[in-house]
Design a protein with these regions (language model features):
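Core domains of carbohydrate- and sulfate-ester-processing enzymes
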Residues: 1, 79, 98-111, 246-262, ...
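Alpha-helical packing segments of well-folded alpha/beta enzyme cores
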Residues: 23, 68, 72, 133, ...
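Generic enzyme active-site microenvironment
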Residues: 9-11, 84, 154, 207-208, ...
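Active-site/binding-pocket entry motifs
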Residues: 15, 43, 277-280, 412
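Substrate-binding/active-site clefts of carbohydrate-active enzymes
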Residues: 4, 13-182
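Conserved alpha/beta catalytic core and glycan-binding cleft of carbohydrate-active enzymes
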Residues: 149-151, 166-318, 338-410, 417-418
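Carbohydrate-interacting/catalytic domains
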Residues: 1-10, 15-31, 297, 308-474
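Soluble or luminal CAZymes and related metallo-dependent hydrolases
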Residues: 18-19, 65-68, 132-137, 182-189, ...
Length: 474
């Protein structure tokens, strides 16, 4: 799949959508490109949320029939929405009718009893060195691709596959033949999985949920790496939440959490998430934030906007029962993301991002540019995470020209206070942020504003010199 296209994923549990056409209508109204379903394979443990798969080739009976699910996928495809499934090839549950000692011997699980059971979850770990196990998991991936025409997988707990010591204390694990903690058999399985899926089903998205800092996980198999398309950026989510959940007066001490992600943003191709597993429902997200109800909502809008404007693929999960104002907000964020190449075309290239303000600790403001190779597609973005509103906030700009606000999270139609910039502004020749030109704008409290940038047209000196002058001979 090309990484130069916008990808905005809606995370949800399929049980929340019971009426025909309801999910497709919601996704179309809010502007998402993809939906990611929590596991749809059969499971027994209700408390697992589906992540303890018991029958890999069966749709859970909680969701209706296979024909129903197939029809749902087709309905979403007709609206141009891709379908991604959460998939659990890292471990399987222990129960009498399951895969554990399927024929009386350790057939699917790791042969070594000390390494077969994961101490954190009490589940069994697959033996990726077994050709039968590899074929079982590969055939399962192709089953969902071929039978239901899904468009990708998010692999859960990839770090439990890659690291022999994941979640284990010293003495609870055995090193590989080189004396290190990498599961070499799992590494080869993932390389094979990613390469064969992409060869057989071009365009399928393969996303890894991995927090163990495996190097270059999204680099190609040809370069001897794992070949995933994207990796969840758990660090980005953790850093942002650790910043916005503290009281505004204390945020200056956590300001670096806002900017830290750009130190590693181009080491992988990331998915940025503010989903159910990160913040819970919208109500639960609001409860985590300081301030009045209005201020809490403003901060949620600012967090969503910061995610959408930061380099990386997007994944959010606003409630299906969210207000019309929030629906309009998500729609406009997605519409801007999809229509502005600067927000996606150079996601994997550091030339597509440039800081303007990233040391405003006391003000809790960051400003940056998103760019393409075309100067006229540049976007100026200013994010204010403080309760202070500004009537004339100055920021340095990349060049002389006209700047027009195309998005403001404080717009009244989103439930904001309406601190917006209604007229286009011309940059002035006044130094700011070590730049020759600057701009003064209204900047709302807990607000994010985005300006399009039109360079000043310069009159060609060649044309002036070559201008014909009519000389009077009188």
């Amino acid at each position: 799949v090309s990484r130069e296209v916008p990808v905005s994923v809606y995370e949800t549990d399929i049980t929340e959508w019971k009426k025909h056409g309801e999910l497709a209508a919601f996704l179309k109204e809010t502007g998402y490109t993809h939906v990611e379903f929590h596991p749809v394979m059969e499971y027994l443990d209700q408390n697992s949320g589906g992540y303890s798969t018991s029958s890999y080739f069966a749709l859970t009976n909680r969701f209706g029939t296979p024909a129903d699910f197939r029809a749902l996928v087709e309905e979403l495809h007709q609206e141009g929405i891709g379908v991604i499934l959460d998939w659990t090839p890292a471990q399987f549950p222990r129960f009498d009718a399951g895969l554990e000692k399927f024929d009386g011997t350790p057939l699917y699980e790791v042969q070594d009893p000390a390494m077969a059971v994961h101490p954190m979850w009490g589940t069994m770990l697959y033996n990726y060195g077994s050709p039968m196990v590899k074929d079982f998991l590969l055939s399962n991936a192709f089953f969902w691709l071929d039978e239901f025409h899904v468009d990708g997988f998010r692999l859960d707990d990839v770090d439990a596959m890659l690291y022999l010591d994941f979640g284990r204390e010293a003495g609870q694990w055995r090193p590989n033949l080189y004396g290190s903690n990498e599961n070499l058999q799992a590494v080869e399985f993932l390389k094979h999985l990613n390469s064969i899926v992409k060869k057989r089903n071009p365009g399928v998205l393969l996303i890894a949920q991995e927090d163990g800092l495996w190097p270059q996980l999204t680099d190609s198999v040809e370069n001897d790496h794992l070949g995933f398309d994207y990796k969840w950026s758990g660090g980005w989510t953790k850093d942002l939440l650790s910043y916005i959940e503290v009281e505004p007066l204390e945020r200056k001490d956590y300001y670096d959490q806002l900017t830290l992600s750009m130190m590693y943003a181009y080491s992988e191709h990331y998915v940025l998430t503010l989903g159910r597993r990160d913040v819970g429902t919208l109500k639960e997200f609001l409860e985590k934030l300081p301030g009045s109800p209005k201020q809490k909502l403003a901060q949620v809008r600012a967090a969503y906007a910061y995610l959408m404007l930061h380099p990386g693929v997007k994944m959010t999960a606003p409630d299906k029962e969210c207000t019309e104002e929030m629906k309009a907000y998500i729609h406009d964020l997605n519409a801007m993301y999809r229509s502005c190449p600067a927000l996606y075309a150079m996601d994997g290239n550091s030339d597509g991002f440039e800081w303007i303000q990233f040391t405003n600790y006391d003000e809790n403001i960051v400003a940056f540019l998103r760019k393409t190779e075309k100067m006229e597609e540049t976007l100026l973005i200013v994010c204010n995470f403080s309760p202070v509103s500004y009537d004339s906030y100055q920021v340095g700009v990349p060049f002389a020209g006209k700047y027009k606000e195309i998005f403001n999270s404080d717009n009244g139609k989103y439930g904001g206070l309406g601190v917006v910039n209604t007229r286009a502004k011309n940059a002035v020749h006044a130094e700011c942020d070590n730049r020759e030109n600057s701009l003064k704008m209204k900047l709302p409290a807990y607000g994010v504003t985005v300006f399009s940038c039109t360079p000043e047209k310069k009159v060609s000196s060649v044309k002036r010199v070559g201008k014909k002058v009519k000389i009077s001979r009188k």
